[in-house]
């Protein structure tokens, strides 16, 4: 039997994704219809293009990233004590296929490929709220956390 695997780029195109403020592209897939209430959870599909970074940011909910297709990402996490950790996200031997971000941590990612992007699902608990989103610029990150300078190289 001939199995053809779908690429991250094909999934991005199939889902009519839009640019995200932190970089990458996304489409919201699950949400509660009543905007007056914050749903217990939310789901987006997210795509990171080759050589792209997603900017450091913090959200007011827990988040899980589940790898779907493409190439691994390098994920940088700064915990509530200001300690930086890094992990590889993907499905190769040295990667994690699911990554958990605790509410309030600062995190970012960058593509490890020049040729292929990464497609993933992001699950938030509770649902993501724009009011709980904080984006950090390069200069601010390097000033507060000098070890992040190499992220931008």
Residue ranges and their predicted role:
Residues 2-100, 106-109, 114-116, 122-153:
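Non-catalytic, conserved peripheral segments adjacent to functional cores
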């Amino acid at each position: 039997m001939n199995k053809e695997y779908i690429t991250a780029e094909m999934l991005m195109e199939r889902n009519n994704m839009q640019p995200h403020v932190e970089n990458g592209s996304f489409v919201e897939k699950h949400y509660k219809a009543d905007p007056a209430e914050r749903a217990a959870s939310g789901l987006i599909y997210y795509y990171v293009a080759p050589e792209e970074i997603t900017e450091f940011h913090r959200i007011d909910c827990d988040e899980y990233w589940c790898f779907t297709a493409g190439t691994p990402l390098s994920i940088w996490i700064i915990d509530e004590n200001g300690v930086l950790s890094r992990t590889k996200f993907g499905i190769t031997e040295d990667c994690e296929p699911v990554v958990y971000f605790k509410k309030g941590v600062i995190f970012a990612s960058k593509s490890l490929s020049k040729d292929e992007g990464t497609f993933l699902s992001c699950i938030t608990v509770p649902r993501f709220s724009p009011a709980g989103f904080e984006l950090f610029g390069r200069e601010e990150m390097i000033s507060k956390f000098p070890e992040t300078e190499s992220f931008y190289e």
